[in-house]
């Protein structure tokens, strides 16, 4: 079996088969790299970001790019590897000059910080140090996921009135004695794995975007493959957040954060590549060593011809125990080798979507996920839902109702009613107009109503996150907090 892209006179043995075409290692690496670079040059804005601009002394001639790197995600690592090769080419062609610099940002949790730093140190020594000897092209940052809570001076308790789906909130100041943590939020409020997964994803995305906003980057490069983007699209629809799809995929407009315009655009350079192609690239370039889940990565589906038959990592999860993200991931992983056209169709269709027309009197953003709100979900749910219970009448019904009141579920409902009345009272007595005008998107409202304990959640107020130059000592600027986690080009902490 020979490579179909090599010259006819010197064909190498094929090692990869993808999209009904056979590749050798060298041709496949070129195929993947070309797909990514094509997306990086998709329009004039991004072409000016990534190419070398003369004269070098001109202001803005070197762009700042933020690359969020997850050490459990192959896509972002492969993207970084291809970007590294592009920068290396630019230094050779332009007398040690490059068109852009890359800041790698990793969000970590307490459980994996040590292994992440170990993997990053290896990555720096093998990939980044060579370029940084020429110039300060790569910078590496770490941020604790708990900084999402530590940087807010106020938090809000959101609660849903289950009679009319109206949302109430109560704000309070944060000090050293009542700082929240991710572990506390997930353990105290989330009833299932789907809600935990959703909140973690929201927190990480917001941290990355806040970091980009504060430090003046020109673009954020996300490592989502075509498969991953399709998973996210279907997940958003299932979660009631379909209106976010157009904004999520938008690479033409500058992003917004808390209704403020940002100076960066979002880019998905891997959107023309299937995840099996990314996994194959990872294996060929021996990049799995930089991930924290090496064993799991090695058994992921790929399109290598000499694929090793590796044992499963254990019994697969039952569907009922999977999160929405895991279910969509499993579906697309199962079909992408034989029916990749389904994945591309999902993405092409989503790319054609535009933002819905808003029926709101004024622009509004969800207080949890920060997505735009186009219609009031509380009013719509109240119109289509019957929430009034049938009255208790017979002796048997009264007996069963008493049993329910004494159960854990009944006690939880009693606690919910008490908390709702307390927050309602606080909201009615508050002089803060914003507290009486709290809005959540439909997806977060449903999340709060069905997957959060007692239908209430404590969440930082994004507009009080002091991560700007005017930050106080208690709420340090985000970049200052990151200083203690910096790794320089020599791999030293």
Curated annotation (Swiss-Prot):
Function: Plays a central role in 2-thiolation of mcm(5)S(2)U at tRNA wobble positions of tRNA(Lys), tRNA(Glu) and tRNA(Gln). May act by forming a heterodimer with NCS6 that ligates sulfur from thiocarboxylated URM1 onto the uridine of tRNAs at wobble position. Prior mcm(5) tRNA modification by the elongator complex is required for 2-thiolation. May also be involved in protein urmylation and in invasive and pseudohyphal growth. Inhibits replication of Brome mosaic virus.
Subunit structure as annotated in this protein's UniProt entry: Interacts with NCS6 and URM1. May act by forming a heterodimer with NCS6.
GO molecular function, one term: tRNA binding
PANTHER family, sorted: CYTOPLASMIC TRNA 2-THIOLATION PROTEIN 2
Domain of life: Eukaryota
GO cellular component: cytoplasm; cytosol
Biochemical pathway: tRNA modification; 5-methoxycarbonylmethyl-2-thiouridine-tRNA biosynthesis
Organism phylogeny: Eukaryota, Fungi, Dikarya, Ascomycota, Saccharomycotina
InterPro entries named in the record: CTU2, Rossmann-like_a/b/a_fold
Effect after changing residue 436 to S: In strain: YJM230 and YJM320
Family: Belongs to the CTU2/NCS2 family.
GO biological process: invasive growth in response to glucose limitation; protein urmylation; pseudohyphal growth; tRNA thio-modification; tRNA wobble position uridine thiolation; tRNA wobble uridine modification
Location(s), subcellular: Cytoplasm
Protein name per Swiss-Prot or TrEMBL: Cytoplasmic tRNA 2-thiolation protein 2
HAMAP family: CTU2 (MF_03054)
Result of altering residue 409 to S: In strain: YJM627
């Amino acid at each position: 079996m020979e490579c179909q892209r090599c010259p006819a006179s010197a064909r190498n043995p094929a090692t990869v088969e993808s999209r009904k075409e056979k590749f050798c290692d060298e041709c496949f690496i070129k195929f993947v790299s070309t797909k990514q670079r094509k997306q990086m040059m998709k329009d004039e804005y991004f072409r000016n970001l990534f190419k070398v601009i003369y004269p070098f002394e001109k202001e803005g001639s070197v762009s700042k790019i933020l690359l969020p790197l997850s050490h459990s995600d192959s896509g972002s690592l492969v993207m970084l590897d291809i970007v590294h090769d592009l920068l290396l080419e630019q230094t050779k062609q332009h007398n040690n000059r490059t068109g852009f610099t890359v800041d790698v940002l990793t969000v970590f949790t307490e459980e994996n910080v040590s292994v992440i730093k170990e993997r990053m140190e290896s990555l720096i020594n093998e990939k980044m140090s060579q370029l940084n000897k020429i110039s300060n092209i790569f910078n590496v940052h770490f941020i604790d996921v708990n900084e999402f809570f530590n940087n807010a001076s106020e938090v809000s308790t959101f609660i849903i009135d289950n009679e009319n789906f109206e949302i109430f909130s109560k704000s309070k100041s944060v000090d050293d004695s009542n700082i929240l943590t991710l572990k506390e939020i997930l353990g105290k409020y989330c009833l299932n794995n789907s809600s935990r997964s959703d909140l973690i994803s929201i927190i990480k995305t917001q941290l990355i975007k806040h970091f980009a906003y504060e430090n003046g980057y020109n673009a954020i490069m996300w490592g989502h493959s075509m498969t991953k983007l399709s998973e996210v699209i279907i997940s958003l629809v299932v979660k009631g957040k379909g209106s976010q799809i157009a904004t999520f995929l938008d690479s033409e407009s500058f992003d917004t954060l808390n209704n403020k315009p940002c100076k960066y655009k979002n880019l998905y350079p891997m959107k023309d590549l299937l995840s099996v192609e990314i996994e194959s690239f990872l294996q060929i370039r021996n990049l799995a060593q930089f991930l924290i889940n090496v064993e799991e990565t090695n058994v992921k589906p790929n399109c290598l011809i000499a694929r090793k038959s590796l044992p499963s990592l254990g019994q697969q999860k039952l569907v009922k125990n999977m999160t929405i993200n895991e279910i969509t991931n499993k579906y697309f992983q199962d079909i992408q080798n034989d029916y990749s056209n389904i994945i591309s169709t999902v993405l092409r269709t989503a790319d054609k979507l535009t933002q819905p027309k808003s029926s709101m009197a004024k622009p509004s953003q969800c207080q949890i996920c920060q997505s735009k709100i186009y219609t009031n979900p509380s009013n719509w749910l109240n119109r289509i839902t019957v929430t009034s219970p049938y009255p208790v009448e017979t002796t048997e019904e009264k007996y069963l109702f008493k049993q329910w009141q004494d159960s854990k579920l009944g006690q939880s409902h009693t606690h919910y009613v008490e908390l709702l009345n307390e927050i309602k009272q606080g909201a009615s007595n508050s002089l803060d107009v914003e507290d009486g005008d709290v809005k959540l998107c439909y997806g977060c409202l449903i999340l709060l109503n069905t997957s959060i304990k007692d239908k209430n959640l404590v969440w930082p107020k994004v507009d009080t996150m002091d991560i700007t130059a005017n930050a106080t000592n208690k709420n340090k600027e985000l970049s200052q907090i990151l200083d203690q986690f910096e790794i320089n080009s020599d791999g030293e902490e």
